[in-house]
Amino acid sequence: MSESEGGKDTTPEPSPANGAGPGPEWGLCPGPPAVEGESSGASGLGTPKRRNQHSKHKTVAVASAQRSPRALFCLTLANPLRRSCISIVEWKPFDILILLTIFANCVALGVYIPFPEDDSNTANHNLEQVEYVFLVIFTVETVLKIVAYGLVLHPSAYIRNGWNLLDFIIVVVGLFSVLLEQGPGRPGDAPHTGGKPGGFDVKALRAFRVLRPLRLVSGVPSLHIVLNSIMKALVPLLHIALLVLFVIIIYAIIGLELFLGRMHKTCYFLGSDMEAEEDPSPCASSGSGRACTLNQTECRGRWPGPNGGITNFDNFFFAMLTVFQCVTMEGWTDVLYWMQDAMGYELPWVYFVSLVIFGSFFVLNLVLGVLSGEFSKEREKAKARGDFQKQREKQQMEEDLRGYLDWITQAEELDMEDPSADDNLGSMAEEGRAGHRPQLAELTNRRRGRLRWFSHSTRSTHSTSSHASLPASDTGSMTETQGDEDEEEGALASCTRCLNKIMKTRVCRRLRRANRVLRARCRRAVKSNACYWAVLLLVFLNTLTIASEHHGQPVWLTQIQEYANKVLLCLFTVEMLLKLYGLGPSAYVSSFFNRFDCFVVCGGILETTLVEVGAMQPLGISVLRCVRLLRIFKVTRHWASLSNLVASLLNSMKSIASLLLLLFLFIIIFSLLGMQLFGGKFNFDQTHTKRSTFDTFPQALLTVFQILTGEDWNVVMYDGIMAYGGPFFPGMLVCIYFIILFICGNYILLNVFLAIAVDNLASGDAGTAKDKGGEKSNEKDLPQENEGLVPGVEKEEEEGARREGADMEEEEEEEEEEEEEEEEEGAGGVELLQEVVPKEKVVPIPEGSAFFCLSQTNPLRKGCHTLIHHHVFTNLILVFIILSSVSLAAEDPIRAHSFRNHILGYFDYAFTSIFTVEILLKMTVFGAFLHRGSFCRSWFNMLDLLVVSVSLISFGIHSSAISVVKILRVLRVLRPLRAINRAKGLKHVVQCVFVAIRTIGNIMIVTTLLQFMFACIGVQLFKGKFYTCTDEAKHTPQECKGSFLVYPDGDVSRPLVRERLWVNSDFNFDNVLSAMMALFTVSTFEGWPALLYKAIDAYAEDHGPIYNYRVEISVFFIVYIIIIAFFMMNIFVGFVIITFRAQGEQEYQNCELDKNQRQCVEYALKAQPLRRYIPKNPHQYRVWATVNSAAFEYLMFLLILLNTVALAMQHYEQTAPFNYAMDILNMVFTGLFTIEMVLKIIAFKPKHYFTDAWNTFDALIVVGSIVDIAVTEVNNGGHLGESSEDSSRISITFFRLFRVMRLVKLLSKGEGIRTLLWTFIKSFQALPYVALLIAMIFFIYAVIGMQMFGKVALQDGTQINRNNNFQTFPQAVLLLFRCATGEAWQEIMLASLPGNRCDPESDFGPGEEFTCGSNFAIAYFISFFMLCAFLIINLFVAVIMDNFDYLTRDWSILGPHHLDEFKRIWSEYDPGAKGRIKHLDVVALLRRIQPPLGFGKLCPHRVACKRLVAMNMPLNSDGTVTFNATLFALVRTSLKIKTEGNLEQANQELRIVIKKIWKRMKQKLLDEVIPPPDEEEVTVGKFYATFLIQDYFRKFRRRKEKGLLGNDAAPSTSSALQAGLRSLQDLGPEMRQALTCDTEEEEEEGQEGVEEEDEKDLETNKATMVSQPSARRGSGISVSLPVGDRLPDSLSFGPSDDDRGTPTSSQPSVPQAGSNTHRRGSGALIFTIPEEGNSQPKGTKGQNKQDEDEEVPDRLSYLDEQAGTPPCSVLLPPHRAQRYMDGHLVPRRRLLPPTPAGRKPSFTIQCLQRQGSCEDLPIPGTYHRGRNSGPNRAQGSWATPPQRGRLLYAPLLLVEEGAAGEGYLGRSSGPLRTFTCLHVPGTHSDPSHGKRGSADSLVEAVLISEGLGLFARDPRFVALAKQEIADACRLTLDEMDNAASDLLAQGTSSLYSDEESILSRFDEEDLGDEMACVHAL
């Protein structure tokens, strides 16, 4: 219920919903309304309840405010019908009723049993009648709501709400189905088979009614988080969905090309249509596929294909379905094996393995990345919201309390008139009036005190004491209650008196004391460590007794277990009673473990008594015995890290509970839908019953849950398709249901589990880290610190435990630190792998002698040292390691004595001797093991030594019979591990994995304990019950004898005889170990449905299964899967991911840039501009323009899409004309793409064409396609007689792929996809070492597998067969890859166990035929699965989540993936990749790049200029900026890297940081991106700041003028002057705001208006430039400066006659009185920057040449001949055509005055940022002044902020030499003053400034008072302002001076203090040139 944000007024208007206003009790005074059912006597305690009521009323009121005035065009709000509807709809019970109806409806749908063939029964018929009732209720609800809210037009109308719309559709569909049912029935229908009208199944639509429970979601806040994060993630998930779809489409089309029609041949008996095999698979009539080996069989076509013809590549849709199935990693190996049978081994494995790696490992892991990112974001938001809510509730309580107290006081005042009022009330009222209001806490405490009814004494004291202070109403209510209780109290009092007397006797006192002592002792005993360990020992014994149970155990063991159970139960009961007595009930109950103990003990007692009495079987509750095992978790008390983990698990339980609710709703909805679609339809195969069906509601739930876990979901889908008539049109649509269910359930919901786990662990991890820090710093405070964490009961022991834990942890940490010091600097995780691996440091010879005889200086030792560190030596050893590994893989596992093995044996001798020599050399250098730094002190060296010694020993023992030798031979496999020590990056990954394993330890313990507990429960439930007879008709071992007949496929003509055997299930629960094994396979989701159905059918020990005997037992498996597989395994995975992340972030800890900043800066430093070729030749240029045009791009895009469609149209058995058409189309497309290639080659010339990777790719495809056509034509022409398949084999398989590859070009088009691809490639760069580690693990396991299981015979029908075996190295690797994807790995494990048939070619002895395989298989496969599934695959996930965090990050944060765009667009401005562009183009460039990097198209030009002010890129002497500097400045400002504080200092710090991270960085590049302080030149930022200030001045001039010119002439000069000064004062804040670059608050003028005014400005005011004296003229290069508002093209900057005629003053700063010269801004300012080393006067010749190169359009020169201004060019931007297509506007350029020759221009700038401003981007810091500025000048002085609370941007100063002589660069005599109070300086006589009047002083004073002191110090500015005021007031300057003197004489001077002159000559000079950019005003 959301409270309305605002008002404190908690008394709403009465609304139709609550009906009542203030009740009668509150009649006396205004107050809170009475709520129904609440008595008038309620006190302040009622506030929370009442507050909720208020909030409800508020919402209702708000809602009514938003209601549509009319509903259905006729019902107004006053209409009684509508009012009654509204009150019904908003009545709470109505909501509850509807929800109950929804539940009832779900139940009805669930109870309904669908029958095959639309059959039915009475129950179903009755349920269909009930449907009508539901329909009526829902229809009524809908109608009422429509009447109440209106239908659709108003925003708050009924259908506008999503949930309502859903309801509406469901109701309409329901009514529609009823109408259809009433239609004429089909002949022959039974009267009660409803639901199938007109042949259309409306029940399927009815099932949508089941979506209604989703309305519950709005009631549970934690569900909101889950749903919100899923909803939020949908947008990035859509991107990924597109990528997945793209992968699927490409693979589907490749599949069509390669595998079209390959699945339709199988082995038939000669001359008949009978399939030769029971389980047929494809074959090949020729080539390298599977041949039919049985006699009388042949390979031929017309077989529908595997899975009834559903799995194939016969057309595009089948291909997509098959590819999707492979991407989900279910059943992909079957498809692969069928393809290998049909085609041979060359191509299929490449196709399928690459598909699984890309589609599953990479793309689908992105889903996880996105979800976990979104989830953590959402959780943070929710947390923030929660905190805010609590804060608000607290405020609300206080407010309510205040309201109540005021109201009580008022009531008392009214009561005062009543003489009979109690004295207490009077005093209370006084207290209230005196302001002694009780606080909320006080009131609640008193209330609590009064409720202690069991303590009479406390009550009496409270009743007396509280009367004085409680509010009157409270006291009233108390007296009432006391009145009621008086009678009882009489009796109570007498009892109490008796009791008191008895208690005071001596005996009782002694007893009490004894009791107290005994309790204290008990408490101490219970809390002692001895007791703790004793209990743990008991738990351990209990565990042992339970774990020792197994099937077929001897009688004595059973008896022992029974006795042990009873004894242990007694002991646990004693412990419980002792605790209860010692601690007291309340303290006992407060601990969670105690409550749990109590529950278990009571359960045990109950179970034992029931069994003894014989009331029940000794089974059901014996499960409770197993629950006792949970007591093991008591260990956590002494194990800090484990208890942290358990805490964080319990923490995530909360989030997971809400997720489970969502999951449950999801499963119910899909189960009901499944029942409607498939109920009773899975009976198409009569020969065997399907178990995963939708025939009843529980069964449907199980099936949906199975699909959710992804196990064999494809099999259920095949059944669904076959139920609807097989792989033809309508039946195939069924797959949509399964695909949606699988995607939503498995990918989204189950990944949210993992996301929650990762998120909670990450936050828990942070907590633990903090705790560790805390523990280290204040161990003394441990007791106090931990009091809050522990229940009061167990404080002392907890403290002890924690102290110990802390000490242990400290020791561990110290050890870790030592280890880390030994390792080379920091184990960087996944991230570091990208870094260039630095050269290994040469380890010096350690001190001490080697072999006791070679000293440190021994020449032999030195020589060896040089040798082993020589790079040739190390590389050679690496090569030998690789070669020896290859030789291992090449061995023949079957025939040990084959020729190949002999040769490899000799190689082995060679390698071993080389490695032995290496080790001896190293021992010579480092010594063996006695001293520090010696050879054997390193783990990796020990590994080397082990591997070599194993090889040496195995040479010594020759007899291969000894199993030791076999083991030693297997150990040679560890050789590749020696490479780890050689490759630095690999070492990092391995260290990372070890850290992960160490961290995972705790989780392993918790998971194993839980697994063990479930295994014990499983043993109790299922031991000995999984036995079956091979003949299903027999149920006991006694019956199961002899043989029986089998009819395959129900064919009576072919009976087979089989023997009856009594067999156990492969996975069973006969003992705890088997149970753990079985449960482990369940937790990997492999084969668990089979186990589940066995458990459901299990009946009793030594009795066969009974179909669906106990369906409820499935709860055991579901709970196990949720707790272990969903939750614990995901936490496991989450931990790995977090560990890798933490390892990766370690390297960012020491430097000041975070990961994202670092990546962006690295990109900016390393990026190079792209070259863009622009041809000179006009014809070539035309082609180039065409090829580069957008239209051409779109045309090619369209062609590729059409090509894709054409490729996708192929299908199996297509007609000859269709074939011909496809060939023609292929040629057409190839021709078109060839033309594209030729055009591009003409446009770019081959050299430039092939530099772009995409072009090279295109060329390859075109050439391949042409070859493809040629080969096809030749084949078809030459071999018409032959079968086309084999002749065109080469072309079909290989060259056809080129057609498909064109699709990949689409990827280069879309923006989002491009970014995804970019990140993919980044991930791949981060993966090489991870991939290397995976390859090593695969290699080692493959070689071990070959040695151990290579001899097992290949038998069809088993898991070790022709497609899946260990006989060759590639086969072994493929088999392991299959296990890594989890495809039935447990079956391969079973097939490798001992007792399997040996391969006939292997060398086994007589009688050893069935001895192949090994028990080692269990350890082998489980360890491999754990390593792969949990560690290795998660390395992928970790890397991907690392690189894709931008998908979920706030898009407005700049990331490295944004920066490619900059390169692309820069190349348009700098086609030659010179790395520099005109600084004017920077604005245009940045407006073309979208935020966050650029400004975006919508950014106004002037705002863009403002943002450039913050960029500190150096401006070169030719007016250009460089590529890296621009990109770096963008990154720096966007990510706020060192932008605060003093800029010089920040720059210095940043330079240090960059040097520290990128040690090999070139100094030149560093100086380019961060100019060093001593060379600071003009930067773009300063340049644009100059322009902005000048522009502001012009604007404010115009505004002021508008304001002042309207007035009539002032009556007196003095008052006119005062008005002028006042207006100047008004202007102050505006000026300050302008200077803070505050764009937001500026008043917006219409752009058109501004332009018109500009036009008028130029036409009416013939003002010219103020010329500088000729001494200032020098060589210069003109740089144009953009202005925000633009001029029409028609306006020329050319000089007019009037301009030429206007005389200009030789005095630069004092305007002529009365002249119009300085009235308004003229056309341009000149700002020239000298070219270095070029002092001759120069025009724009060089510039023009460069401009021509850049193809700059027209230019206008603006010459003022008389004034002698140097020529200056106004440049229009080269991209004008692109940028201003719509408007006829070009930016007006302003140019600044020239700088004298021979010196660099240098700005002095001070920028003071306004506080609290985030949107402004000021340039911080004090900038460097020119080289000539004095060393003693106080640089920081201007930084003193003005006292107005708002800082200002000081304008920029262009310091120049020239006419004013040395004055402008003179030394400052003292620090510059900021403004203080208003004071007028004395007259200042300065020869260079002519006469100054009193008016100047007044203007200065006003400026200073307004915080514009910096302007006041500039005499030219003051003169200008004075001139402005004079013009505005229509005074001459002399009149103005006189008026000023009069004002001062009249005593205004008392306002000013005359202490000292503000303008000293030096200050003035320093500030004088401020107007360099503004003096044209």
From Swiss-Prot:
Residues 48-59 have a biased composition (Basic residues). III repeats lie at residues 858-1140. SMART domains: Ca_chan_IQ (SM01062). It is linked to Night blindness, congenital stationary, 2A: A non-progressive retinal disorder characterized by impaired night vision, often associated with nystagmus and myopia. Glycans are attached at residue 295. This is Voltage-dependent L-type calcium channel subunit alpha-1F. I repeats lie at residues 79-375. Voltage-dependent calcium channels are multisubunit complexes, consisting of alpha-1, alpha-2, beta and delta subunits in a 1:1:1:1 ratio. The channel activity is directed by the pore-forming and voltage-sensitive alpha-1 subunit. In many cases, this subunit is sufficient to generate voltage-sensitive calcium channel activity. The auxiliary subunits beta and alpha-2/delta linked by a disulfide bridge regulate the channel activity. Interacts (via IQ domain) with CABP4; in a calcium independent manner. Residues 112-129, 181-201, 260-347, 550-564, 611-620, 680-733, 891-906, 958-963, 1023-1112, 1210-1224, 1274-1290, 1350-1416 are extracellular. The chain crosses the membrane at residues 93-111, 130-149, 162-180, 202-220, 240-259, 348-372, 530-549, 565-583, 592-610, 621-639, 659-679, 734-758, 872-890, 907-926, 939-957, 964-983, 1003-1022, 1113-1133, 1191-1209, 1225-1244, 1252-1273, 1291-1310, 1330-1349, 1417-1441. IV repeats lie at residues 1177-1444. It is found in: Membrane. It comes from the Eukaryota. The gene is CACNA1F. One of its GO terms (biological process) is detection of light stimulus involved in visual perception.
